[in-house]
Structures are given as structure tokens and as C-alpha cells.
């Protein structure tokens, strides 16, 4: 049974949020390396919602990013932090 996603910050729709949570849970269940988890999420989002999505997954990182309005989310699944955003 997977852990629930804990939202920290977001400016996306509830529908897109739920989709990203679902894709991310699938990635965590399917892959062990953080790099592979991030790559899976990025490829899914690029395919379904157009390019260019960026995905950072890890336990310890800082960030300061510019993103398209309505395309940013930061959340946790267990000990892993997920920063997902789209740029033009």
C-alpha cells in the first residue's frame, strides 16, 4: 500500500494535482532510483500535457525556479520530496 502524497505548495488545478500524485505514486512503486522516478514522471507529463516539464525528486535539495503560471507543485511521498513544474 502506497503512502499518501502530502501537498506543500501548488498553483495547479485539483485535477492536475491528483493526476501528478497518481503518476508519482506509480513511479515510486515501480522504480528505486530517484533519477528514474523523476524521469518517469517527466516523460508522462510531457506526453500528456506537452513540453517542457521539470521534475526534481530527492530527500535534500534547495530550489528557486521560474515556472508557467498554473504549473507548479511541491509535495512529499514518504521521505521523498517532489518538485514538479512546467516552463515555456
From Swiss-Prot:
Sample GO molecular function, one term: dynein intermediate chain binding
Gene3D superfamilies the record matches: Protein Inhibitor Of Neuronal Nitric Oxide Synthase
UniProt keyword annotations, A-Z: Cytoplasm, Cytoskeleton, Dynein, Microtubule, Motor protein, mRNA transport, Nuclear pore complex, Nucleus, Protein transport, Translocation, Transport
GO cellular component: cytoplasmic dynein complex; cytoplasmic microtubule; meiotic spindle pole body; nuclear periphery; nuclear pore; peroxisomal importomer complex
Listed SMART domains: Dynein_light
Localization, UniProt: Cytoplasm, Cytoskeleton; Nucleus, Nuclear pore complex
InterPro entries: DLC_sf (IPR037177), Dynein_light_1/2_CS (IPR019763), Dynein_light_chain_typ-1/2 (IPR001372)
Keyword Nucleus: yes
Main location: cytoplasm
UniProt GO BP: establishment of mitotic spindle localization; mRNA transport; nuclear migration along microtubule; nuclear pore complex assembly; protein transport
PANTHER family on file: DYNEIN LIGHT CHAIN
Family label: Belongs to the dynein light chain family.
Function according to Swiss-Prot or TrEMBL: Acts as one of several non-catalytic accessory components of the cytoplasmic dynein complex that are thought to be involved in linking dynein to cargos and to adapter proteins that regulate dynein function. Cytoplasmic dynein 1 acts as a motor for the intracellular retrograde motility of vesicles and organelles along microtubules. May play a role in changing or maintaining the spatial distribution of cytoskeletal structures. Also a component of the nuclear pore complex.
Quaternary structure, from the entry: Homodimer. Cytoplasmic dynein consists of two catalytic heavy chains (HCs) and a number of non-catalytic subunits which present intermediate chains (ICs), light intermediate chains (LICs) and light chains (LCs). Component of the nuclear pore complex (NPC). NPC constitutes the exclusive means of nucleocytoplasmic transport. NPCs allow the passive diffusion of ions and small molecules and the active, nuclear transport receptor-mediated bidirectional transport of macromolecules such as proteins, RNAs, ribonucleoparticles (RNPs), and ribosomal subunits across the nuclear envelope.
Name the record gives this protein: Dynein light chain 1, cytoplasmic
Species assigned in the record: Eremothecium gossypii (strain ATCC 10895 / CBS 109.51 / FGSC 9923 / NRRL Y-1056)
Lineage summary: Eukaryota, Fungi, Dikarya, Ascomycota, Saccharomycotina
Gene name linked to the record: DYN2
Amino acid at each position: 500500500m502506497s503512502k499518501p502524497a502530502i501537498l506543500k505548495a501548488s498553483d495547479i488545478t485539483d485535477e492536475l494535482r491528483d493526476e501528478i500524485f497518481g503518476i508519482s505514486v506509480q513511479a515510486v512503486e515501480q522504480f528505486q532510483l530517484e533519477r528514474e522516478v523523476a524521469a518517469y514522471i517527466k516523460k508522462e507529463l510531457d506526453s500528456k500535457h506537452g513540453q517542457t516539464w521539470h521534475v526534481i525528486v530527492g530527500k535534500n535539495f534547495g530550489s528557486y525556479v521560474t515556472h508557467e503560471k498554473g504549473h507548479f507543485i511541491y509535495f512529499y511521498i514518504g521521505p521523498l520530496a517532489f518538485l514538479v513544474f512546467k516552463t515555456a
